[in-house]
């Protein structure tokens, strides 16, 4: 990304972060054109995104605007299809460059490990790596799904598994001396177990070498209870599975996932008979309404979710779903208060919040102001 000298992205056009593109899978998956998707709302033409992501719909269903929408955002809040987009001032980011950043990058490279920070082009990469933290992504760099929001490359891993990866992850976590470790993965629908065996092995290898708190951010394993149980039995402290968006938008945003299936996964974690905390995340700015957000928060809480993140969706490239709205920080604060009132244990809600952002603080591994290293 380009940025001004104050290390922000103020007064610039929405970035095209499509430096690396996934393989063209158009031969096997026809292009989708969404005409309408439930109530409320209508569809607005947002143009054709083109290869190599032909499965991303051409239209995004927008709900009617309600009072308070983009409160305080002025002309920077709502984004109409095709218009010149300026990132609002609250979306400034820190560019990488500290010594800790360089050390983290070198250690991960030496152990041939991939981070979701890089693959998903997270806006917090500079901030987190400067703290000596990173979220390690296992099971390769190709995802068997093609969600309209995600920057991770889609592809066909063809069953490949690096069975030495758990050892390398364990050694890296120990070398980084982390208090809180986050492990995630691409979706691996090509594997019979969805990758759950590797998740469990990674947890065990970390336990051999470190007393760190372990958080895993997992796919839905296609709803297979045995695969989820395999991860639960490895006993991480936190299991995170992101609901991502409101139910109405799931067919567009997460076409290979299901809203009810994600809720059921969280319920199984909460009812597992362990002390594992269930965590989830929502990204906003895709056309959801406040009423839909309230329902989603209530659904998550009713299914045992204890920890929650809410952040702004940022379009990784022109081939991904467009941003409908840059949500003002005041609304993030309101959603945080609403979620806490529903009984969530801890909530991180803000424009630049992501699933693993300050995960140690959210899970209570450390208290605000304490020296912390989380991965």
Region locations from a protein language model:
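Auxiliary Fe-S-binding modules of radical SAM enzymes
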Residues: 2-9, 13-14, 24-135, 167, ...
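Conserved glycine-rich "GG(E/T)P / GGGxP" loop and the immediately following alpha-helix
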Residues: 181-201, 287-292
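Glycine-rich, proline-tolerant flexible connector loops at the mouths of alpha/beta enzymes
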Residues: 185-193, 247-254, 317-319
């Amino acid at each position: 990304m380009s940025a001004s000298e104050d290390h922000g992205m103020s007064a610039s056009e929405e970035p095209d972060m499509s430096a690396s593109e996934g393989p063209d899978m158009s031969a096997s998956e026809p292009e989708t054109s969404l005409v309408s998707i439930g109530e409320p709302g209508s569809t607005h033409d947002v143009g054709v995104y083109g290869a190599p992501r032909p499965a991303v719909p051409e239209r995004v269903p927008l709900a009617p605007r309600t009072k308070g929408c983009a409160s305080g955002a002025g002309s920077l809040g709502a984004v109409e299809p095709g218009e010149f987009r300026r990132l609002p001032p609250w979306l400034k980011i820190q560019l990488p460059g500290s010594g800790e950043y360089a050390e983290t990058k070198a250690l991960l490279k030496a152990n041939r490990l991939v981070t979701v920070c890089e693959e998903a082009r997270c806006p917090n990469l500079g901030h987190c790596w400067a703290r000596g933290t990173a979220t390690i992504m296992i099971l390769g760099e190709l995802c068997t799904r093609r969600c309209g929001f995600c920057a991770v490359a889609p592809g066909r891993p063809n069953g490949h598994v690096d069975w030495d990866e758990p050892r390398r992850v364990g050694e890296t976590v120990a070398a980084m001396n982390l208090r809180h470790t986050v492990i995630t993965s691409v979706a691996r629908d090509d594997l019979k177990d969805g990758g759950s065996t590797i998740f469990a092995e990674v947890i065990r290898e970390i336990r051999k070498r470190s007393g760190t708190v372990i958080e895993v951010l997992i796919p839905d394993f296609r709803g297979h209870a045995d695969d989820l149980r395999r991860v639960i039995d490895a006993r991480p402290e936190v299991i995170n599975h992101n609901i991502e968006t409101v139910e109405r938008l799931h067919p567009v945003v997460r076409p290979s996932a299901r809203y009810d299936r994600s809720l059921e996964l969280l319920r199984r974690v909460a009812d597992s008979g362990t002390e594992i905390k269930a965590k989830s995340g929502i990204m906003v700015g895709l056309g959801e309404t406040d009423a839909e957000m309230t329902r989603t928060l209530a659904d998550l809480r009713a299914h045992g979710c204890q920890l929650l993140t809410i952040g702004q969706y940022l379009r990784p490239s022109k081939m991904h779903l467009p941003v409908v709205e840059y949500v003002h920080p005041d609304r993030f604060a309101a959603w945080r208060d609403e979620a806490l009132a529903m009984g969530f244990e801890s909530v991180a809600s803000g424009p630049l919040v992501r699933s693993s952002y300050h995960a140690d603080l959210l899970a209570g591994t450390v208290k605000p102001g304490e020296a912390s290293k989380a991965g």
